[in-house]
Amino acid sequence: MPELKIKTEKVEKQLTKEPLVLKTPKEKIDNLGKFYATGKRKNAIARVWLKVGKGKIVVNKKTIAQYFPSETYVKTILQPFVLTKTIDQYDIICTVRGGGISGQKGAILHGISKALDKSAPDFRAILRKGGLLTRDSRVVERKKYGQRKARKKTQFSKR
């Protein structure tokens, strides 16, 4: 029993000390005041620069409406701004390569969310709750030899 008393006293002393102040890591901000982040989805990789502006979004030197013809893609990309209520407050420039349109959309969404998190740490809880900061790690399963596809096998005949 005396050992437990000593341990609890040590813990109490540590708790009464001043709380540790965690140093925030230096965020990726370039000399022009832009927040930089990378987003990934499937085989697509997006590099995103975010700066305070009027809500202009450029993807591979095209407007977002030109690059993504479907309106639903544009709405999902704007989801981080809707959650954080910052529509038309930031300008975005991003370059995307690899994958298809859906993968590129997911990569841009992930990159924008990460850049918003760096711009204002208050958004972290909101974006985390919306599931926008977690990387979707699902990728295409490889084709196996002796099979038609990744999971599909050749037709089996008993006799």
Curated annotation (Swiss-Prot):
UniProt keyword annotation of Ribonucleoprotein present: yes
Keyword rRNA processing: no
Alphabetically ordered keywords of this record: Ribonucleoprotein, Ribosomal protein
A GO CC term attached to the entry: cytosolic small ribosomal subunit
Alphabetical GO biological process terms: translation
Pfam families: Ribosomal_S9 (PF00380)
GO molecular function: RNA binding; structural constituent of ribosome
Family note: Belongs to the universal ribosomal protein uS9 family.
HAMAP family reported for this sequence: Ribosomal_uS9_B
NCBIfam families xref list: PRK00132.1
Entry-linked PANTHER family: RIBOSOMAL PROTEIN S9, SMALL RIBOSOMAL SUBUNIT PROTEIN US9M
Name of protein: Small ribosomal subunit protein uS9
